[in-house]
């Protein structure tokens, strides 16, 4: 529509009179408003009916059109008048288009502002005039009347007012047509104008910010639709706005500047094309130096990238990569925001999981606890939505966090995995494939029970009861769940679950004992006993400090409330059912709830206790259900295969489960049906199944004889048969079962003992093992009845016929250890014979005869002879290892009885201790574990803890680490025992860990490796052993323990060695070890020189009483020795040696005892030198099989020369690095030189020492001679290193002893003297 060129208002032709439509009188200000309205309606009708082609009418009513734009109408106070005038004006613009009848710009502006104001009437759809308002809107939109305003200089004011009006009036009562006309009107202005000003843009965008969006949802929708429709036109304006605010920082350009990030999010959701020019600006903002600004951009982009159906990450890879970089932002809130975003991203965009995985991995190790926590939440939430959204790596991050140092993170990880397990493994919500993907969760959750924290243990118990085997299930379903869970668990998880039940049962026992004390009359002793029980119970609850106070309060309530005591008694009663248990817990909790408090920590602590002791899984009904499941597996009618286990596995695991439960819930087994099923198991071919069944009878069958005679009559012959001809384990259990459940046990045992004792035949060792087991256990359980016949059997058969004869020749394959199924029957019989001797003595537990003394000499002699008691050389190396282990274990077992410990001589103790340095890895490993278990249970005397000091000499890093852990555990157990038991203070000599030092010093002084007390290398070895123990003991200086240790060692220097008081050399060794100990203590502690409040007591068995006239203030360590002990380095005097000798010179490392290892060349050398694996890298997960390899099959491997050896390799220091493995399992190989066959055999060394570095510079001959030098390593044989082809060394040198070996051979020749002493 164009404007006429005339500057003045157009006048009608003629006399200037206004022509009104037919029937319409003149409209002036002289008439009433009602009359004006009446006449205007007719005018409106006239204009409505006119069209653009009516030229005559247009001319006729032109004056009227001009009149309607007068002040009278435009400023009329009556809204009906104004509405009708607006409708007329809209029609006038339609009719006269494209030339408007109004030529004044001011008049036009006034008219359009007037029309815009009338549009406000659209707000009320229920108004009688709404149709006219709608007509006005429709007319304006259809004609695009507002486009006339483009020619006005200040048209923006009109458009802003129009947009504001339309956005303000729209509401949910408007239909689609109203919205469409509004859109048409506004979009035409935007699309046909020269551009959108910032003010006009603000009127649109303001409707998108959250505050306005929530106030008027329809205005928000209108703005969205408008922007979508005009995207091509308005994008440039939007880009300009954001450019000024984001890049140029001109926040004053708009009042919406502070809402830019909200607007970007909304605009992106409307159409990403609106922001096509804005996104690069965000990348710039992501790199801002202002942390808060980066955080705001990250929050925004997180929403954009994470939005459903968003393709921003694929469309804008640079921005995506830049955003991912913020996962490593220095600002904690930014990293936190990124992690939170990852959850939405994983759920909405699984394809981006790969990009996120690496960044989440780094954040799972973030130093900030909240971030590690949120990583877990992110992954678990995605996994709960769909397991396919999280890959194995992401789940692995959660698994790692179960061991986080922070409890909150550990808890989140454990609970999250438990929820996934319940959803996908228990309820199978996503099929078997998903269940298989996370089948590891059950094992890893139970493994957490191994952690020391009580919080971890309690959470595992809670998870087990709620997620793994939900206690809310019906009994049959619950037991099916437990049955197959137990069958699928790995070994460590099974042990953890067993330990969990054991701990709960122990706690039930403590509560039962506490209730029993309440039944006794009040006394000081009773109160003290109660206090002890409460302290032990508190240790099994979270936050033991608070738990002690709450348990005291709970105990007080128990004393006052008899009903509460009765309910607690019912809860821990062996006959309490699961349903009764839940009811009891509710009742006890309800009683303790009053008075009600918002938080009641006392009640929470009691709940923890009740949850641990309540039997929510196992009762008689549950055991019956388990037995039925077992029967189905045996019959082949169970769902074993569907549950992912074979029937055999299900049966074996089911029996093992019942066996464990028979310890903790024996009463629940007492039913004929259960025992009938167990009898069927006894008849099965699977030895493990039968063994478990016997053990269940043993644990639960105390009432069988009186209440179930039919079961008794069937069971007795089966037990007899198992004791005579079953496996060794079955025989043991059968004998114990008879002893436990039958009243006439003497008769029953005699019926087994007599035929077995008559049928012993050493020539058929295969048939000897089970009888020896049965006889040993019978003699232990019924010593009075069988002591006399057993003495005869021991003397005539066990010792003379079996142990002192070698009937077969062992396999000379050179291995130091073989698998259990490869051990010869004769050796197995000999091992059982040694165990029989021990059981026989344990049964007697007295020393009235000389049986104990003479019997003890036998394992001692076995150790002296290195396992070859007859010394006929018939027995193999691996069999000798087995017998040494049996002999050492026998002395350990007997030492646990006070009566036998008293008669074990210091020499026998030293022999027993040296087994921990045996040359065979498995002997050291098994022996150390037996020693640790007995010590940690406080069964062995304190002196045996000193044996762990010798582990410093173990060449295998893992064995040293294990020994250190054992020491830490033993020391903490003893310290805790002293704290918890007031009576323990009377036995400090046998409990206080510091009192191990005198035993350790004495043991090291008698170490066969200490041949030359002033030898610097030997002194360094002594220091390593002392430091191995003292480092752990001196971690804390509790009660001035450092000065106590110093005084103890100084006191030892004022005594003599009780083992050989008149031997000056022996005493000198003792004093030198003392000086080394004092040196170590002084270097470790700055407070050791303070006065000790206590005077240490020394063991009279090892030290003479101090002589008051004897003052030993001599220093036995030279200045050079002190430097060596301080630095760990031995200065070697320069010697003229050949090139190879100089290259192969041994080096040492500070503070680490050097071990000579065999270094294999690239072409390989023959068998191993010693019993450590050649490479520490292969020892991380050691098992028995890793110790046995092809190299061990060679008794006398041929030494091959290397084709070429790099000079650098030859120069590798002997004591610095462990050699690379020549092959798997060189650990237990024995190598020797075939050319050495003509050499006279060396005296047998004491076993198991790691090889020593040569004191002087290594020469070619020393290196080569290591092969035959059995004495060089004190029982350790070395393989020759690869030889350089240029070397002139002759292989004859291999048969020569090294100088060190020659020197050490002399004291070894005195070894037989020790044997004579033992046999006196």
Swiss-Prot record:
UniProt region (Disordered), positions on chain: 1158-1320
Subcellular location: Nucleus
Biased composition (Low complexity): 1255-1267
Keyword match Ubl conjugation: no
HEAT repeat ranges per the UniProt record: 156-195, 272-310, 388-426, 709-747, 990-1028
GO biological process, one term: negative regulation of DNA replication
Protease in keyword set: no
Function text: May regulate sister chromatid cohesion during mitosis and couple it to DNA replication.
Family annotation (PANTHER family): ANDROGEN INDUCED INHIBITOR OF PROLIFERATION AS3 / PDS5-RELATED, SISTER CHROMATID COHESION PROTEIN PDS5 HOMOLOG A
Name this protein carries in UniProt: Sister chromatid cohesion protein PDS5 homolog A
Gene: pds5a
